[in-house]
Amino acid sequence: KMVEEALKYNNVESILEEGDEMDIFGPEFTEILEDIKMPTSKLEILIKLLRRQITEYGKTNQVAAKKFQEMLEATIKEYHDRRKFLSEEEAGKTQEETAESIIKNATEQALNILKGMQADRESFRKLGLTFEEKAFYDILIHLRDENNFVYGKDENVDGIVVNEKCKSLAR
């Protein structure tokens, strides 16, 4: 059974190595991920594909890619820290259960990052901008927030913060 699971993992690994583009936002990817029963393998594949997708996203939208990269690195760091510092009680009889819980938690966080990226990638439509204009819009909002200056008024439209002045500049 474990050998069979390892072979499934190797098939996904070979896709990664060949450099074939895998749509991690499509239902096929979700099915592939659900088929992987080994939690550590699932997490590793998810992290590798997220890193690749974040790098690709950064070619168009560096601000959003940086945000997602920071979220992913924080997830990975938390995962490693929790594994490293298992309490003695956790390291006893329940070590395997605790390790599985840690892996499951990290996988859920990585999947949330994936969902956030998907929502961000589609948000340009709700803003009425092109994909490239949305990237520029994100830069304007980021610089405004980073430098603490007021520019226009933010409104929440369908769960997305919209600033009409920044939006008109992005066009």
PLM regions: where:
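Catalytic cores and motor modules of nucleic-acid processing enzymes
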Residues: 1-171
